[in-house]
Amino acid sequence: GAAGVLVSRLCEPSAEVGMIAAETVRSYDDGGVRIVSSPLARAVDTARIIARVFDIAGYPCEGPELDERLTERFYGSFEGKTCEEIASEQPEAYAQYRAQGECDLAEVERSEVVGKRVRDAVLEAARVCRDDQSLIVVSHGSAIARGIVSLLGLDPAVFNGLRGVDNCHWSELVPVGMSTFKSAAINGWRLASHNIGSREDILGA
């Protein structure tokens, strides 16, 4: 979060979520949306506000549906602590995490595991979308980045070229070429934009 605490699966409330909803609707010109969300409170709050704004704007909206696979990466014994606290209390584990981005010592969820579950959730949701719908997936910074990398056909345990998505920011993926959502699992995805937001002072996912 913005306070620098690894909140991961701790259900802290979301903030400034109306902004992302308004920005999403402002750039929208399609035939309907389907919303799928992590079940953590801060994500559900965001998803419901987005759905409400679409409803007020008169656009057809399905969801939000909740999917456990979209939860944030699990940070094991690092949960709920600042980096300073982790470095002081678990120096060996912290050093491993800083060097590798992984930490079996603290039982941090492996990047490839996070990426696969997020990818699977997105693909499953995309397959049931109509061709004229857009899919909005509400998740969390580290999970989003690893899910995107996995959707692009890369290994998130190896490729570290995408940072986590900041609070009230979003990324956009589109099916390759003229593919539909239903065929994107075969033809692949293209990252159209990443970590886009309307306020630079809202950071920290």
Q: What positions do the PLM features span?
A:
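GST superfamily/GST-like fold recognition
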Residues: 141-145
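Phosphate-handling substructures
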Residues: 4, 8-9, 52-120, 203-205
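A short acidic (Asp/Glu
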Residues: 45-48, 146-150
